[in-house]
From Swiss-Prot:
One of its GO terms (molecular function) is transcription cis-regulatory region binding. Keywords: DNA-binding, Phosphoprotein, Transcription, Transcription regulation, Two-component regulatory system. GO terms for cellular component: cytosol; protein-DNA complex. It comes from Escherichia coli (strain K12). Phosphorylated by BtsS. InterPro entries: CheY-like_superfamily, LytR-like, LytTR_DNA-bd_dom, Sig_transdc_resp-reg_receiver. GO terms for biological process: phosphorelay signal transduction system; regulation of DNA-templated transcription. The modification 4-aspartylphosphate is found at D54. This is Transcriptional regulatory protein BtsR. Changing D54E: 2-fold increase in btsT induction. Residues 3-116 form the Response regulatory domain. Disruption phenotype: Deletion of btsSR has no obvious phenotypic effect under the conditions tested. The lineage of its organism: Bacteria, Pseudomonadati, Pseudomonadota, Gammaproteobacteria, Enterobacterales.
Length: 239
């Protein structure tokens, strides 16, 4: 079975695509999302083989969402849009295919045929990475979704319950992005197995006798530094 996830902010567009895909005996629709933040979480949780992704969505576009996905678990991307002006950009973002709305069933059939053929010979994890840097981190908290600009991020931490972003004001939000994705797509520096830090907010490094250290940020918060990452941290600040 080919596991499919649909991410589109238009309910009617999702329904039309769903109805057609449900007629395919080898297609399983594992989920539907109405925005990119939900979509990122669904990709990480459901691990679809194929992502049908609308390009034009509020706050975070489909093109931006692709750059936020963990490259090791990125599905085949089929972009959906009503405007063909995005075609070249879509394929720069490593799209498998590109469909114009309203979707033509014959054209979609060709896409599915190519997907079936491709899945039989290629591991999706070998698809090239999108190296474009992230300008913000999508976060959720207190029944809202917000975009935290990189300059306002103090540090990011990974816990049993997920990945959390702390702002320079000390406010905390949950993100669906992984530490691996954030490390490769942002200026944040790894200082610990469970922490990334924004050196722009660093005020002091407090060295400890056991070879570890603690970072004191400008907002007074502290971030641990493990022995493994202390050398690279010093090099990053010119020591």
């Amino acid at each position: 079975m080919i596991k499919v996830l649909i991410v589109d902010d238009e309910p009617l567009a999702r329904e039309n695509l769903r109805v057609f895909l449900q007629e395919q005996s080898d297609i399983e629709i594992v989920g539907e999302c109405s925005n990119a933040v939900e979509g990122i979480g669904a990709v990480h949780k459901l691990r679809p083989d194929v992502l049908f992704l609308d390009i034009q969505m509020p706050r975070i576009s489909g093109l931006e969402m692709v750059g936020m996905l963990d490259p090791e678990h990125r599905p085949y991307i089929v972009f959906l849009t009503a405007f063909d002006e995005y075609a070249i950009k879509a394929f720069e973002e490593h799209a498998f295919d590109y469909l114009l709305k309203p979707i033509d069933e014959a054209r979609l059939e060709k896409t599915l045929a190519r997907l079936r053929q491709e899945r039989s010979k290629q591991d999706v994890s070998l698809l090239p990475e999108n190296q474009q840097a992230l300008k913000f981190i999508p976060c959720t908290g207190h029944s809202r979704i917000y975009l935290l600009q990189m300059k306002d991020v103090a540090f990011v931490s990974s816990r049993m319950s997920g990945v959390y972003v702390t702002s320079h004001e000390g406010k905390e939000g949950f993100t669906e992005l992984t530490l691996r994705t954030l490390e490769s797509r942002t200026p944040l520096l790894r200082c610990h197995r469970q922490y990334l830090v924004n050196l722009a907010h660093l005020q002091e490094i407090r060295l400890e006798d056991n070879g570890q250290a603690e970072l004191i940020l400008r907002n007074g918060l502290t971030v641990p530094v493990s022995r493994r990452y202390l050398k690279s941290l010093k090099e990053a600040i010119g020591l």
